[in-house]
């Protein structure tokens, strides 16, 4: 069995970490896994780091990183994966909702046919204000990217190391790793996993994520579909804008002819506010979208050269 690296971001999860470590260690011992755990404290304000320090002191296969601030899950995963040494990387949340007992089943699914196994919380122990938006989000991701999973948001995943070597996470792109990996030719599958009710603390996510998630989805759709050929996308917007302008010019030309012939009392088309505002907004919206996508492309390319986080401490 290849050696395993559990990469676990944690933000204010002081009450869960010791129990999670014990559960992972039990599963690893029962299956004779050669493993390590990399905890990443993402700027916690409680005693999360103290618990991690004590676990690292007592267990030589527990490593840890403390980030200087709350950089988000994507940055924490990137930092943890960089520190890890395993051939396979297992990511899971620190809140005990992901069940380590599912690891053998997930590893069994990672055959020669697949490079990433994503968990699917088929039966979720979450309130409806989390489950319904998640269903809509997963449907939209499948529609726009072609990567159809039931649960893109599930943090419980098994990766071949090469995925983290080639897919550079930044912002809040952690939920789109299957999409980004598939765009690079990696093979992705999904299996149902047990999802447990939260035992300690409170959820760090809610409805406020939806607008950001949708914008990130548009970004990923652009990066995976037009990364190497942005002119295909920007050209379509340009053609649409040109067509609107051409139609306006044509309409004014027809108007001018009619006015000269029979309707001198008509208000000139170019003096009608609705038309002027509509054309102006169309052009402005196209310019803003184009600049936004180009900025995202520049950021995505730049992330391969600069880490999106700052490390305060390491325990190796």
Predicted regions and their residues:
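Short beta-strand/loop segment that forms part of the nucleotide-sugar
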Residues: 21, 25, 33-43, 65-66
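Acceptor/aglycone-binding surface of glycosyltransferases and processive sugar-polymer synthases
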Residues: 63-69, 73-83, 88, 97-183, ...
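A conserved acidic beta->alpha catalytic loop
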Residues: 41-50, 96-97
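Acidic helix N-cap motif at the loop->helix transition within catalytic regions
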Residues: 15-19, 46-55
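Hydrophobic helical membrane-anchoring modules
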Residues: 176-316
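Short, well-formed alpha-helical segments that are part of the catalytic scaffolds
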Residues: 13-28
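Cell-envelope/extracellular polymer assembly enzymes that use nucleotide-activated donors
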Residues: 3-5, 36
């Amino acid at each position: 069995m290849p050696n395993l690296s559990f990469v676990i971001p944690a933000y204010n999860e002081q009450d869960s970490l010791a129990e999670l470590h014990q559960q992972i260690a039990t599963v690893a011992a029962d299956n004779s896994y050669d493993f390590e755990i990399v905890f990443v404290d993402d700027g916690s304000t409680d005693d999360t780091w103290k618990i991690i320090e004590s676990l690292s002191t007592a267990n030589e296969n527990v490593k840890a990183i403390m980030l200087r601030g709350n950089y988000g899950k994507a940055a924490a995963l990137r930092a943890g994966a960089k520190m890890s040494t395993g051939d396979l990387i297992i990511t899971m949340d620190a809140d005990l909702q992901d069940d380590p007992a599912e690891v053998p089943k997930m590893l069994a699914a990672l055959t020669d046919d697949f490079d990433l196994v994503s968990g699917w919380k088929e039966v979720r122990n979450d309130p409806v204000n989390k489950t319904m938006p998640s269903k809509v989000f997963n449907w939209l991701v499948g529609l726009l990217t072609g990567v159809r999973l039931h649960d893109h948001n599930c943090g419980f995943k098994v990766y071949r190391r090469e995925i983290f070597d080639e897919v550079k996470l930044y912002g809040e792109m952690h939920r789109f790793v299957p999409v980004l990996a598939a765009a690079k030719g990696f093979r992705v599958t999904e299996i149902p996993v047990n999802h447990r009710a939260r035992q300690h603390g409170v959820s760090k996510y809610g409805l406020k994520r939806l607008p950001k998630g949708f914008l990130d989805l548009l970004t990923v759709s652009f990066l995976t579909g037009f990364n190497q050929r942005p002119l295909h996308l920007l050209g379509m917007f340009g053609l649409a804008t040109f067509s609107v302008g051409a139609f306006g010019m044509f309409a004014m030309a027809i108007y001018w002819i009619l006015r000269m012939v029979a309707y001198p009392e008509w208000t000139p088309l170019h003096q009608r506010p609705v038309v002027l505002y509509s054309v102006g907004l169309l052009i402005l919206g196209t310019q803003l979208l184009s600049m936004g996508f180009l900025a995202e492309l520049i950021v995505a390319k730049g992330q391969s050269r600069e880490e999106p986080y700052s490390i305060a401490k390491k325990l190796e």
